[in-house]
Amino acid sequence: MIESKNQSFFPNRFDCVVVGAGHAGSEAAYISSKGGARTLLITMNLDTIGQMSCNPAIGGIAKGHMVREVDALGGIMGKMIDNTGIQFKMLNTSKGPSVWAPRAQAEKKEYQLKVKHTLEAEKNLSIRQDTVEELIIENDQVIGVRTGRGFEIFTNHVILTTGTFLSSLVHIGTYQNENGRMCEPTVKGLSKSLAKYNLKLGRLKTGTPPRIHKNSVDLSVLTIQEGDSNPSPFSFSTDKITRKQIPCFITYTNAETHKLIHENLNLSPMYSGQIQSTGPRYCPSIEDKVVRFADRERHQVFLEPEGYETSEIYLNGVSTSLPEEVQWKLVRSLKGLENAEIVRPGYAIEYDYVDPTELKPTLETKKIKGLYHAGQINGTTGYEEAAAQGLVAAYSVLHSLRNLTPLLFKRSESYIGVLIDDLVHKGVEDPYRMFTSRAEHRLLLRQDNADQRLMKYGYDLGLVDQKSYDCMKEKYERVNSVREKIYQIPLKPSDKFQNLLDQKGITNYKFGMKLDSFLKRPEIKIKDIEFMIPEVSSWSDLEKSILEMEIKYEGYIKRELETIQWKNKYLDLAIPEDINYEMIAGLKKEAIQKLKSHKPMTLEKASQISGVDPSDVDLILYHIKGKKKQEVEIF
């Protein structure tokens, strides 16, 4: 260790130290410094700040919702992808609006550099290349960190965002190496430091697919997948996406692929016993897919370009840790990839995590004051889940530094609230991934209204500027004003209206009925009736969507709000000891197993069991109260 007197020539005291510069660390460092805290970000490699370690994409089902929420709260992920995306799509538009979700392919290296440059521009943020090997604790309070090169940095607030680097081990067949990502060193000392203070550590596994050379693929025989013609931005501050979009492609596994995998399962670290830790349930390896879904004749594989100029293509759906020579055979068994060249092999990686039930809802550890965890160290998977946690941890630090009451995100107001509540109360048994099904109030948590739900918190901390906040308020004032007008406008005969009726094939209507009732018809969109409310013609697509959703689904929204109040009354409701969960129609098999094992005494305790979703708790409540689910079903 370098003596303190030799450290006087450089700053070694900060309000907050963030360890790790992935998606959790980048958000944490940005929010902390933007909020006025003198912040130090420590990363083992400045060139990998904000790196996309796995898929080159941001967003997706529920994940896109969280990116919008992070943006509304002042975070950077939404802005970064808007500036570096190469294909944008709104997913699930054929379903209800609660599950619509933005997703974008990224120009991978450009995204990483954009994050790095954004952080470098923050005046309250210092960035240093080093590792953190040990926490410095006194009287159960963190007072600093000790780095790999022996320097001591002092602070009362540390946010650990260590990703997959804690005592990590890479597997490719029988090959093993102590890496945190392929060819990047692991960090062992920090795991020992955490265990020293009796934080409960566990072991998880994740994986990544091989990358192939674009010029070795016959794209002409593959199914093309284009982006949206009018793409939706992630950030509420982005007016329009103008970047050139490029396509992705789709192929499928086949009988030859599956035969090859079965013949080599004994060489897979997950099936040979080499890997003992648990992998992500909802993002299985191709080996797991073939074994678990043996009745499936094929599995979809997306070919996702990693940028405009690079030749690398990401094979989404073929995560594997089979030996490299088997990976070549596997990839070349796919249509269009018969001559494919692998430039990076797929691999599995095991790493330490800390049981998230060790945390408060602020993401501060219960045992060590001032120590916060965010990202994969909490047992989650995904860039978006990590970014959300990094933001929450930094919010908590800012509230602590300002002696403010901690901000606790509610399940009823955000997916971030669902994420944090699930982690700290239920813990994890496998890497946690967010889904819309985890949110019981998802119709209220649409991706289009994240700013209305959350921006006030960012504004209060100075993380959202006055102009952005005023624009948000003015937007919803416009929406509310026109919505009230629509309630009053009667349908009247006109040539334009008759043309609309003829176009839609509508005959069952009455003149005099109000416009809101007409808009609630499934075949009618807000764009169809703009001639009756001309003021909306200048609105953004997002504003029009909000207006349409709030009118079309106002009955469901009202019932959802009533349901929140109704359910809150029954959290302490006792569950009968003799309840037969197998007799409750619709209850998931996993939930039945967990409920029978844990034997919760109340609905609240049932809701805190990992694997028991809000919809399962609803079914139990309806069963106990003797109500039929369809009588109170939430949209």
Curated annotation (Swiss-Prot):
GO terms for molecular function: flavin adenine dinucleotide binding. Disulfide bonds: none annotated. Keywords: Cytoplasm, FAD, Flavoprotein, NAD, tRNA processing. GO terms for cellular component: cytosol. Its cofactor is FAD. It comes from the Bacteria. NAD(+) binds at residues 279-293. GO terms for biological process: tRNA methylation; tRNA wobble uridine modification. Signal peptide: none annotated. HAMAP family: MnmG_GidA. Homodimer. Heterotetramer of two MnmE and two MnmG subunits. This is tRNA uridine 5-carboxymethylaminomethyl modification enzyme MnmG. The lineage of its organism: Bacteria, Pseudomonadati, Spirochaetota, Spirochaetia, Leptospirales. The gene is mnmG.
